[in-house]
Amino acid sequence: MTLEQYGFTNFFKEQKIAATSSYGRVTAVFRDYYRVITENEEFLASLKRGNFYELSSTSLPAVGDFVEVSSDAQILSVLERKTVFSRMNKDSEEQLIAANFDYALIVMSLNHDFNLNRLERYLTVAWDSGATPIIILTKADLVEDLTAFAQQLETVAYGVPAYYVDNLSHHGFEALERDLKPNSTLVLLGSSGVGKSSFINSLAGTDLMKTAGIREDDSKGKHTTTHREMHLLTNGWIVIDTPGMREFGVGFNQAGLETTFSDVEELAEGCRFHDCSHTQEPGCAVKAALEDGTLTMQHYENWLKLQREMAYHARKNSPALARQERDRWKVIQKSLRTHLKTRPKK
């Protein structure tokens, strides 16, 4: 086994490390240790604490990271990343999930898990990661007519390739395998029970992952993946599995949102006011599209929701933005008090 088989390309080879160190890739993350594979072996490594003491949590190694590792199994540094997937927790802190992948596979099942709002959220973080998003719709055998699902995807994921697969019959995998570049790293995103583990087994051609069935009463799956882990498949693809995430916060980088909602962003360019909030201003092209049916209310409301969420996280992480928002509301409240004092009495 060579490190090149684990995606060690020139981008990482050109990043210099000490002559006494080795290049490695993190294949699993545990509480206090990291599983690392190098050119010669695979072992558990720990952080050299002094090198990471004052760094943020996003500077710590994640599954998929290439690292500099010492002869005594200590991680000395993390190499520059090509792509990264993170999420915001309830305290508006960024949590790193995976790094250095080529494709972000958004896995949803064609049962009660299929949710356009959640799909738009996943697409936002997938585009923001820098990787190519792909939609995987599992349990296609449960649906007789896929037309309705295809039409819904057109409204929120235009241009993003979607594959309808059946993990049992292997239907749909030939097209996916034909389109994926060889030796690529894939990260799987999706809720628990959508069939991510079964999907990996089908892609690998063997029972690599432990799987569990779904409850018949609500079509929800049992949770089988408990930590983030990388797998090298015999066909050359590298797969990063992640625990199911039904709800997660988006960050405050607008790039992913603008790509996912490119149709709304294009409409917004036609608004009369450059700072239009797209809620009540005259001459709003977005509101006009709502009225004539060009834009659906669900798509619009989810866009606004994610916009507000990003703005909230940005303020939480930027004292200047938080202060600016407080000052804005002070002006609004002052104007309201002045209006109430000067309005004619009845």
Curated annotation (Swiss-Prot):
Cellular component, GO, one term: cytoplasm
Keyword Aminoacyl-tRNA synthetase: no
Location in the cell: Cytoplasm
Sites where the protein binds GTP: T138, K139, A140, D141, G190, S191, S192, G193, V194, G195, K196, S197, S198
Record's cofactor remark: Binds 1 zinc ion per subunit.
Similarity comment text for this entry: Belongs to the TRAFAC class YlqF/YawG GTPase family. RsgA subfamily.
Name recorded for this polypeptide: Small ribosomal subunit biogenesis GTPase RsgA 2
Organism of this sequence: Listeria monocytogenes serotype 4b (strain F2365)
Gene: rsgA2
